[in-house]
């Protein structure tokens, strides 16, 4: 299974209802937003369709990724998931199939002082890559997993998104000694576009 590599670039234009990494999510009006999780990215599925050679992913609509990763930005007073495989409350993936015929709004996250907390949004550029591609990606094999498959009951689950540790202009994301966060989904759930039951696991060498 090939990977879809995700390269990040400085955003030169407004990325409203476009694929973007960090920033604030653009969601349908009155969407139930998990404000206790960090927004990672939103991905327009029509931008990844040509690289999804096995037709595993949706090819229209938008995918949204949220996770309890504030701790890994160095905010050590924040909640940190303790299980090897995270509970569903700690990782959320949402799929909105129709992005053409409804009204969207940007949800801005703020702290107790009403200061915006989102990281600077970045443009996402997609390309085809080999299965073991490192960095940020979708699909393929986990780059730094040191065993053959995920443990039961997650054996055979698909890598929906791999999030790499990195130094950004305004912060550092470090998953336990420069590891990676792997967001996983059951293959049948992915086929049925059901993203309600996902998990994630941090691997670090």
Q: What spans do the regions from the language model cover?
A:
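Preference for intrinsically disordered or flexible, low-complexity segments
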Residues: 1-205
């Amino acid at each position: 299974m090939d990977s879809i590599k995700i390269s990040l670039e400085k955003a030169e234009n407004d990325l409203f209802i476009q694929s973007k990494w960090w920033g604030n999510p653009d969601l349908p009006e009155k969407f139930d937003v998990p404000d206790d999780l960090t927004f990672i990215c939103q991905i327009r599925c029509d931008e990844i369709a040509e690289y999804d050679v096995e037709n595993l992913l949706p090819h229209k609509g938008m995918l949204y990724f949220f996770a309890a990763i504030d701790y890994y930005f160095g905010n050590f007073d924040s909640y940190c998931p303790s299980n090897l495989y995270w509970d569903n409350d700690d990782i959320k993936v949402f799929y909105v199939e129709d992005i053409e015929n409804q009204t969207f709004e940007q949800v801005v996250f703020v702290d107790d002082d009403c200061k915006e907390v989102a990281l600077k949004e970045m443009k996402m550029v997609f390309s085809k890559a080999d299965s073991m591609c490192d960095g940020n990606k979708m699909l393929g094999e986990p780059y730094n997993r040191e065993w053959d498959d995920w443990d039961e009951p997650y054996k055979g689950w698909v890598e929906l998104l791999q999030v790499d540790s990195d130094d950004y202009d305004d912060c550092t994301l470090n998953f336990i000694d420069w590891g990676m966060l792997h967001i996983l989904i059951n293959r049948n759930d992915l086929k049925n576009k059901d993203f309600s039951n996902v998990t994630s696991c941090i691997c670090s060498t």
